[in-house]
Amino acid sequence: MTTTIRSGRLSGWESFCNWVTSTNNRIYVGWFGVLMVPTLLAAAICFTIAFIAAPPVDIDGIREPVAGSFLYGNNIISGAVVPSSNAIGLHFYPIWEAASVDEWLYNGGPYQLVVFHFLIGICCWLGRQWELSYRLGMRPWICVAYSAPLSAAFAVFLIYPVGQGSFSDGMPLGISGTFNFMLVFQAEHNILMHPFHMIGVAGMFGGSLFSAMHGSLVTSSLIRETTETESQNYGYKFGQEEETYNIVAAHGYFGRLIFQYASFNNSRSLHFFLAAWPVICIWITSLGISTMAFNLNGFNFNQSVLDAQGRVVPTWADVLNRSNLGMEVMHERNAHNFPLDLAAAESTPVALIAPAIG
C-alpha cells in the first residue's frame, strides 16, 4: 500500500483561485470580476481617448462627418463618442475589419468597442454582486435591484439599435448626445404617450418621494442616545442590535397624516417596497424602449378633434404632434431622409419667389 502525502504548498493556480474567491480582500474580485476588470478598463480607456481626440464620424453614412471630441471644438457638454456609421449598420465592426485605423475611426469603430465592452462589464458587475452575496450567505436581491439599470443600458445601447437596423441609432456617449437621443426618440416614437414610459416616470419620481419620506420619518423618530450638545449621529454604534429609531412612532405619525393603512408596520416589507417600486418600474420602461425599438410606438392622436361644423378643435395632442415633426425635421435635415409623414402631405408654398443662390 502506498500513501501519498500532499505538500502544504499550493500551486500558483490554487493560490490564484483562493485570492479571487476570498472575501477577506479589501475589494472582492470574484470570477466575474476577472472578466469585469479588463472589459470595463478597455471601455473606459477607449471612451476617454475618443472623447478627447477622436476624428469626426460619418454617423449618417452620407459623407457628412460629425465631430464629437475635444480636439475638434467640443466641450464637456457638447462632446460625445459618436455612434458608428449608418453605412456599417448592424455589422460587428472591430478594428481588424477595417482597411485602416483611419477608416475604423471615420466609421465610428470606437463606439462599438466602448459599448460592447461596457455591456459585458456591467453584466459581470451584476454577476459579481450575486457571487459576493452567495459567498457571504446573503440573499441575492442586490443584483436583482441592479438588473434595472442594466436592462435600461441594454435597451438603449443594444436592443434599440438592433430594432432600428443600425448602431448609428444608438445613444451617443455624451451629455448633449443623450439629450439628442431623447428628443429624436420622442419625435420618432412619441415615447411621452407610451404607458410604459409613464410607469417609469412614476417609478423615478415615486421612488425619490418614498426615499425622502422614509429618510425623513426615520430621522424624525430617532431614539435619543446623546445630549443636546452632541450630534444625534453619535447615538448609533456600528453593529448594534438595538433599533436606532422608533418605527411605532413613525407608523403612528404617517398613519395619522394620511390614513392608517398607508403606513407600513413591518420594517422588512417597507424596505422591500422601497426597493421593488423603482426597480419594477424601470424594468417596464426598458421593456417599453425595447418594444418601441421595433416601432410599436406610443399613442398618437394624428387625427385632430373636429366640431359639428368640421372645424379643428385645438388640443394638446396637436401641439405635441407639431413639436414631434419639428424635432424630426431638425434631426433628419437631408432631403432623402425627410420625414415620411411630412413628405407624404401636399406641398405648402412657403415663398413666392425662389431665393437667388450665389
Curated annotation (Swiss-Prot):
Biological process annotations from GO: photosynthetic electron transport in photosystem II; response to herbicide
Binding site for a quinone: H214, S263, F264
Site description Stabilizes free radical intermediate, residues in chain: H189
Ribonucleoprotein is among the record's keywords: no
UniProt keyword annotations, A-Z: Calcium, Chlorophyll, Chromophore, Electron transport, Herbicide resistance, Iron, Magnesium, Manganese, Membrane, Metal-binding, Oxidoreductase, Photosynthesis, Photosystem II, Thylakoid, Transmembrane, Transmembrane helix, Transport
Binding site for chlorophyll a PD1: H197
Main localisation: membrane
Coiled-coil spans in chain: none
Classification via Pfam families: Photo_RC (PF00124)
Residue numbers binding pheophytin a: W125
Residues annotated for chlorophyll a ChlzD1 binding in this entry: H117
Membrane-crossing segments per the record: 28-45, 117-132, 141-155, 196-217, 273-287
CDD domains: Photosystem-II_D1
Catalytic activity: 2 a plastoquinone + 4 hnu + 2 H2O = 2 a plastoquinol + O2
Entries under InterPro entries matching the protein: D1/D2, Photo_II_D1/D2_sf, Photo_RC_L/M, Photo_RC_L/M_CS, PSII_D1
Cofactor note: The D1/D2 heterodimer binds P680, chlorophylls that are the primary electron donor of PSII, and subsequent electron acceptors. It shares a non-heme iron and each subunit binds pheophytin, quinone, additional chlorophylls, carotenoids and lipids. D1 provides most of the ligands for the Mn4-Ca-O5 cluster of the oxygen-evolving complex (OEC). There is also a Cl(-1) ion associated with D1 and D2, which is required for oxygen evolution. The PSII complex binds additional chlorophylls, carotenoids and specific lipids.
One annotated Gene Ontology cellular component of this protein: photosystem II
Superkingdom as given in the UniProt entry: Bacteria
One Gene Ontology MF term: iron ion binding
Family, per entry: Belongs to the reaction center PufL/M/PsbA/D family.
Function, as annotated: Photosystem II (PSII) is a light-driven water:plastoquinone oxidoreductase that uses light energy to abstract electrons from H(2)O, generating O(2) and a proton gradient subsequently used for ATP formation. It consists of a core antenna complex that captures photons, and an electron transfer chain that converts photonic excitation into a charge separation. The D1/D2 (PsbA/PsbD) reaction center heterodimer binds P680, the primary electron donor of PSII as well as several subsequent electron acceptors.
Protein name: Photosystem II protein D1
Origin organism lineage: Bacteria, Bacillati, Cyanobacteriota, Cyanophyceae, Synechococcales
